[in-house]
Design a protein with these regions (language model features):
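Ligand-binding face of N-terminal immunoglobulin V-set domains in extracellular IgSF glycoproteins
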Residues: 68
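Protease zymogen maturation seam
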Residues: 77-122, 132-136, 156-167, 389-391, ...
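Glycine-rich, phosphate-binding/catalytic loops in enzymes
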Residues: 139-145, 281, 313-315
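Substrate-binding/access-modulating region of protease and related hydrolase catalytic domains
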Residues: 231-313, 329-345, 349-355, 364-366, ...
Length: 439
């Protein structure tokens, strides 16, 4: 029976077949098939001493959170430990770069009466890395403004308290800079292959040396702390388990140095209720109250894409949500979020007009076949970190691709009090052009 101390996606992943997990774009995130180990985020209470052992590795974080690596066979038993309050599956992260310095009126803040430049504070980023040779991240004497760089993708010498990656100090980075690019990058081999992290840090804190002061960032006189997310794997996009450890590292560094810090997060995803109740979101809320800390997030790149639908359903009313699926779509999923107290009948219709429903409101996975598409559906039930109910629908190809055309999700109000509902598709440009909800 599904465990209500485990989030919906992890429950579904445990119940899905290996073939279903391979076809899904979500269910295997956090799982290493080579070692058969899962990375998960947990919230716990009490001492951390009893969390590890017997092939279970734990990275304790601030505030009673931790990242745990454990065998798949141990997940259910581990969740039943008294000190484990909740367990959450990692989610894949995507770029959410924002470029709004002018629109934010930052220049007037920098040049006004107070002349705020970031001097004396720390700017931290958790992203795809940084080009530490870039002039905008170097002082006038050529030395680095970066005090610490934790590259999670290079194994060797992780920071104290963590188990992955390599930490580089300002002294090591300065030595690499003095050697020049060819020799220096051998000493400190951390790179930013996508350029996303370098752009983000430039907007947040670049000093403008590369452009003679024209393209200065917001806090251009601040000192810098950088975390490059990522563990080498087939799919290079990072996960929430890496993000939460990066935030934890930055906060601990700021506390050790006794300095205020602003953290920029320009990675994200569309998964969740968008009410701030995931473990990652509650962790960010918690650490935001520690010390002198501000956490800033990007607004995303999906504002003009048809990835969200919502409305209010009245009792006895029927709503039809139309979803266009373009050709050659290998997989997709839909999250439907609503209040637990609202009872709705849910039907799904494929482009050929064949329909299933009403879906059973029961714990555990439900499986249906419509045309050449398999539907894997999970009804979420109340849990300690679930403020709203999730109905998760995975569209899996019977052969190679999900059936293209116009799908319909039909909602019928049975016993309705509030009636609000929201549907989300994955973001991060993971879907083909033409896939999305109709306006």
């Amino acid at each position: 029976m599904p465990d209500q101390k485990i989030d919906n996606l992890l429950n579904l992943a445990m119940d899905a077949t290996p073939q279903e997990r391979r076809k899904s774009g979500n269910l295997n995130i956090g799982y290493d098939p080579a070692t058969r180990l899962w990375d998960v985020i947990i919230k716990y209470s009490g001492p951390e001493s009893g969390l590890a052992g017997n092939g279970i590795q734990v990275v304790p974080l601030l505030g009673g959170y931790a990242v745990v690596t454990l065998p798949e066979s141990e997940i259910d038993e581990y969740s039943h430990r008294a000190q484990v309050e909740f367990m959450e599956k990692p989610k894949r992260l995507y770029f959410e770069l924002f470029q709004a310095k002018g629109a934010s009126c930052i220049r007037t803040v920098q040049t006004g009466r107070n002349g705020l430049t970031g001097k004396g504070i720390l700017t931290g980023v958790v992203d795809s890395g940084v080009d530490y040779f870039h002039p905008d991240f170097r002082n006038a004497d050529g030395s680095s403004r970066i005090l610490r760089l934790w590259d999670q993708s290079i194994q060797g010498n992780p920071p104290q308290g963590y188990v992955t990656g390599t930490e580089y100090t300002k002294e090591q980075i300065d030595e690499a800079l003095a050697l020049g690019e060819n020799q220096g990058r051998r000493l400190v081999p951390s790179s930013d292959y996508s350029g996303h992290g370098t752009s983000v840090l430039g907007i947040a804190a670049g000093n403008g040396r590369a452009s003679d002061g024209v393209n200065q960032g917001v806090a251009y006189e601040s000192d810098l702390l950088v975390v490059k997310m990522g563990i080498p794997r087939e799919n290079s996009f990072p996960r929430t388990t890496e993000l939460i450890q990066g935030i934890d590292y930055l906060v601990r560094q700021a506390l050790t140095m006794g300095r205020p810090m602003a953290i920029n997060l320009s990675f994200g995803n569309n998964y969740g209720s968008h009410k701030g109740d995931s473990l990652l979101e509650t962790y960010i809320d918690m650490v935001s109250s520690i010390g002198r800390l501000a956490i800033c997030t990007g607004t995303g790149n999906n504002g003009n894409q048809p990835l969200h639908e919502g409305g209010t359903l009245k009792q006895g009313q029927t709503r039809q949500i139309e979803l266009s699926v373009s050709s050659r779509e290998p997989t997709l999923n839909v999250q439907l979020w609503k209040s637990y107290e609202d009872e709705m009948s849910i039907y799904i219709e494929n482009p050929s007009g064949n329909r299933i429903g009403p879906l059973d409101e029961k714990l555990g996975p439900q499986r249906y076949r419509l045309g050449n598409t398999d539907l894997l559906i999970y009804y979420g039930k109340p849990g300690p970190y679930h403020l709203t109910q999730e109905i998760y629908i995975d569209f899996l190809p019977g052969k190679t691709y999900v059936d293209s055309g116009d799908w319909k999700i039909i909602l019928s109000g049975k016993k309705v009090r509030g009636g609000e509902y929201y549907l989300w598709l994955p973001g991060g440009n993971t879907l083909n052009r033409g896939t999305g909800f109709y306006e």
